[in-house]
């Protein structure tokens, strides 16, 4: 999909309701990076919200660079990074919490809960649920994501749960969709 078409389509799908909503976003691999930028831009710039960005497949600093290249102010984002600590070490960063790895669901759950409990955030982007399937059993990921969705609802937060459009992820997305308000296929 062309860049401008992708942006217009995502905005159209996310717009329309003033109510808080949680959505499953199924993304083609070739559109993945651009779609994550567009979704972040939507919440940060268009809606002017503060949010949590959980990353399981790229270090937070790579996401920061991508946002900066696209003139998106990331100062209202808090990152939960499940990559950097395992890959290359980490530093204490004010707007980032480091989780051991994508397999550490208890640690990830605690980090998400701690961030949400501050009451400072309006949305959460989960990038990507598909990566969790590489490290964890399908049923465990289903339960974890259901827990996360309930946590978002209890704090009246928006959420974007990102999936790669492949067979294994589709199986999980089909289960998770029943707990969500919106389904977007790119």
Language model region names:
Residues 157, 164-186:
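Phosphate-binding/switch region of NTP-binding enzymes
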Residues 24, 52, 123-126, 160:
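Structural motif
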Residues 56-60, 83-86, 157-168:
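Short beta-alpha junction loops
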Residues 9, 70-98:
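Nucleotide-state-sensitive switch-loop elements of NTP-binding domains
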Residues 1-66:
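Glycine-rich P-loop/Walker A and Walker A-like loops and their local beta1-loop-alpha1 context
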Residues 47, 73, 178-180:
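Short, structured coil segments at secondary-structure junctions
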Residues 88-144:
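Phosphate-binding/switch loop-helix module in NTP-utilizing enzymes
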Residues 141-167:
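Substrate-engagement module of ASCE P-loop NTPases
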